[in-house]
Regions:
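Non-catalytic cap/lid and distal C-terminal segments of serine-dependent acyl enzymes
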Residues: 22-312
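N-terminal export signals
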Residues: 5-21
Length: 312
């Protein structure tokens, strides 16, 4: 894969707006258009309600997912959809997961900066920080994006839909840069989110110069040092929160293994065991929606393992 193709993959990488119904394979999909924020750019938000939502008074856990336009509907997706509604409808019918409300937070043209963890950038050596910020078009905007999620969007969702509002019932997930901000969300706001599923997490932050050799080795070592320090110092206490990571070994994912292995060690050294931490390799999987769709049952089951239903 050439440099231009890798860059294109990485860059696929816009208060309460008007709501309108969308089409879902099952359940009900509602689009809240142009949701304004004091902390982040205005964007659409899609909310998927599970089958049976309108026929009962049950309250539901909530899964927040980034890149919301790619989750449910191929007509709004840039590179194919995840099929979240299809996967969850089948898993719910088989009693494999709890029935969640899924909040799909659409990205904007500031996606890369909104998903770039500010703590990591602050921990980088100055020259690396400058290089990353030049690639991304400016400093991280993740603090404002997370404030939008926790201080504006979550109260709106909890006030509009029948949700279970506590952290034990609130999860977050994303892919690539969305994996980074999902992990950061649990670390920064463990009082809001109890679990994160991070697919094809984009640990290297950039794609330039990632061909094997001395430059990759030097970049990786300095970056892993920053990552491990930030993660070790920011993890919630063991026993209260959960983290899922995965990766393929093709296209952009081919660069993640050496990062992920080292970072997995930080979680294990902190005491995160199999019930609280999972890191999986899917051989042959690429860095795209088709691959994430193909294995989505695994992180969904990790996040939403069954427990008794609660009602109002």
């Amino acid at each position: 894969m050439n440099r231009r193709s890798l860059l294109a993959l990485a860059a696929a990488l816009p208060f309460a707006g008007a709501a309108r119904a969308e089409t879902a394979a099952a359940g009900r999909l509602v689009l809240h258009e142009a949701m304004a924020s004091a902390h982040a750019k205005t964007r659409n938000v899609s909310v998927w309600l599970p089958p049976g939502y309108d026929a009962s008074d049950a309250r539901h856990p909530v899964l927040y997912m980034h890149d919301g336009q790619n989750l449910f509907d191929a007509s709004t997706a840039n590179f194919g959809e995840w099929g979240v509604d299809e996967h969850l409808t089948r898993l719910i019918a088989g009693d494999q997961v709890r029935a969640p409300i899924v909040v799909g937070v659409w990205n904007t043209d500031l996606r890369l900066r909104e998903y770039l963890p500010s703590d990591l950038i602050a921990a980088l050596p100055a020259e690396m920080r400058d290089e990353v910020q030049a690639i991304y078009g400016g400093p991280p905007l993740s603090v404002g994006y997370l404030r939008f999620l926790t201080d504006e969007l979550k109260p709106f969702v909890d006030g509009t839909y029948r949700t279970l509002t506590g952290p034990e019932d609130t999860m977050i997930s994303g892919s690539s840069m969305g994996g980074l901000i999902s992990m950061q969300a649990v670390m920064k706001r463990p009082d809001v989110f109890s679990a994160a599923a991070c697919l094809s997490t984009h640990w290297p932050l950039k794609v330039e110069g990632l061909e094997p050799g001395p430059r990759l080795d030097a970049w990786r070592e300095r970056l892993v040092t920053a990552w491990t320090g930030v993660i070790a110092g920011g993890l919630p206490p063991v026993g209260t929160h959960r983290f899922y990571f995965d990766r393929g070994d093709e296209t952009l994912d081919q660069f993640y293994g050496q990062f992920q292995t080292r970072i997995d060690g930080v979680f294990r050294e902190a005491g995160y065991g199999p019930g609280r931490f999972q890191s999986l390799l899917f051989p042959g999987a690429q860095h795209n929606e088709a691959s994430w769709n193909g294995r989505l049952d695994v992180p969904l089951t990790f996040l939403l393992s069954p427990r008794p239903t609660q009602t109002s």
